[in-house]
Design a protein with these regions (language model features):
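Active-site segments that bind and position negatively charged phosphate/pyrophosphate groups
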Residues: 22
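Zn2+-dependent cytidine deaminase-like catalytic core
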Residues: 39-134
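Intrinsically disordered terminal and processing segments
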Residues: 1-4, 112
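Charged, amphipathic alpha-helical segments
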Residues: 3, 8, 91-95
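Small-residue (primarily alanine) positions within well-ordered alpha-helices
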Residues: 10, 28-29, 58, 62
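Short beta-strand scaffold segments in enzyme catalytic cores
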Residues: 25-31, 109
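Short, basic/aromatic recognition patches
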Residues: 4-19
Length: 134
């Protein structure tokens, strides 16, 4: 699957966002090593701490389905009803969650609508805390 196709699926996933507080919808598409794709959208909550980011919705859906190998995740975000206009990178909690189930080679694909930026998870969370830290 191409980066562009994965970005398209992340953009489609934004439609399922529940974001009445920020008015920012985010979609994610996670590519598993067997070609399966899981999508997610952010789900907000009035008390904020229970809010779940799109990346974790996709990741936890994949893990719940028994997947453990991941190749790439695409993230697309912006104000509800508008095309993406800036990069949305995974927050620290999402980076940590992704690192639990992938090595530093997971490709993180982000777009501002005009250009695409690709980083590895290792670049985004250097010296990350993993099970090897025990």
């Amino acid at each position: 699957m191409s980066d562009k196709e994965l970005i398209g699926l992340a953009a489609e996933a934004r439609a399922a966002s529940y974001c009445p507080y920020s008015d920012i919808s985010v979609g994610a598409a996670l590519l598993c090593d067997d070609g399966t794709i899981f999508t997610g959208a952010n789900i907000e909550n009035a008390s904020f701490s229970p809010t779940v980011c799109a990346e974790r919705v996709a990741l936890f859906s994949a893990v719940h389905a028994g997947k453990r190998g991941f190749v790439a995740i695409a993230i697309v975000g912006g104000p509800v009803g508008e095309p993406p206009s800036k990069l949305f990178a995974p927050c620290g909690v999402c980076r940590q969650a992704l690192s639990e189930f992938s090595d530093g080679n997971l490709r993180v694909i982000m777009t501002d609508g005009d250009s695409v930026t690709v980083k590895t998870l290792g670049e985004m969370i250097p010296l990350g805390f993993t099970s090897d830290s025990f």
